[in-house]
Amino acid sequence: MTISFANKVAIVTGAGGGLGRAHALYLAKLGAKVVVNDLGGALDGSGGNSEAAEKVVAEIKAAGGTAIANGASVSDDAGVAHLVKQTMDAFGRIDVLIANAGILRDKSFGKMELKDFEAVVNVHLMGTVKPAKAVWEIMKAQGYGRIVVTTSSTGLYGNFGQTNYGAAKMSLIGFMSSLKLEGAK
């Protein structure tokens, strides 16, 4: 069986490196037009520009694929609106959203500031919810759409110094478990 994403458009968040980059490259290899989203900051979410996303786009284009870069924050309403508008303006549809963006601010809970807890939950959870909400009606109107979320065993089993990350990742499991039921209707 041959898998093809020809004529499909995929947004991959957090695609400037790691799993997101791998997802973007593979989807492009299978024929998808890919929107490579990455804020390009440090692992803790500080700093950033679209350079990381642009490098992945260059890799995709060098291999004969089609891609555009987006450096917006997926935890920001205006950033998500720009991401979706840029995708629709460039390609006219959105078939796949891979919500992979994330940051780390590891510290034991007793030493962690609430702002660091909130920042991680905001990027992982709301940085998934906001893009999913933004593409939901587009996908429904098309009669096709797939939303894939990156989670972690830390959400189920925990990991020292990652209460924020574990809470965010477990919440994604609940979010997707409910969303898949709604999407099936």
Where are these regions (language model features)?
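A short, exposed helix-loop element centered on a Lys and neighboring polar residues
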Residues: 132-133, 177
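Active-site helix of classical SDR
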Residues: 20, 132, 168
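Active-site loop immediately N-terminal to the catalytic Tyr-X3-Lys motif
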Residues: 110, 157-164
